Amino acid sequence: IFAAGDIVGFPALASTAMEQARVAMCHAFDLKYKMQMGAVLPYGVWTVPEIATVGMGEDEARAKGVPVEIGKASFRTNPRGQIIGDTEGFVKLVFKADDKLLVGASVVGEGACELIHVPATAIHFNATLDYFIEAVFNYPSLGDAFKYAAYDGLQRLQRRVSKAMEARSRATPSIGTATPPT
């Protein structure tokens, strides 16, 4: 018995159901081409505004003990967002704090269900924030927001490191501050 779609349960999305059906058919006809689902599944809700996610969210990652940081960029400051009038949309990247490996992303706003494929591909290929910083995005495009979300993430990470170093230096007594014995 092969099953696909809503009967399988979560996530009950058309895109996932179609991939489940392809896998089921390959198993049913013993075709070796596509024998399993991909590990990275994007979720998209075609509402106004569109909402899309992939990978782990910030809370989920922390609940699993993964030390993460985020980077965000608003469509309000993105030239394409300004042109099309989407000033409420944003992209959010979730990455591991130790090696900057991308583990999740969210997009809210115009084209979110299309844009989510950029971080989905990055997660699939184990990309870090460096990918988004080094990538060249068309201008003006909403996709360019990923670059600025990566820069924001690096700034947040730097602030975290600076605070930790500052706390460590306060906890360590300075040389020469001890009172000499009398």
Task: Specify the residue positions occupied by each region the protein language model found.
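Helix-loop-beta segment of a Rossmann-like dinucleotide-binding subdomain
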Residues: V40-V45
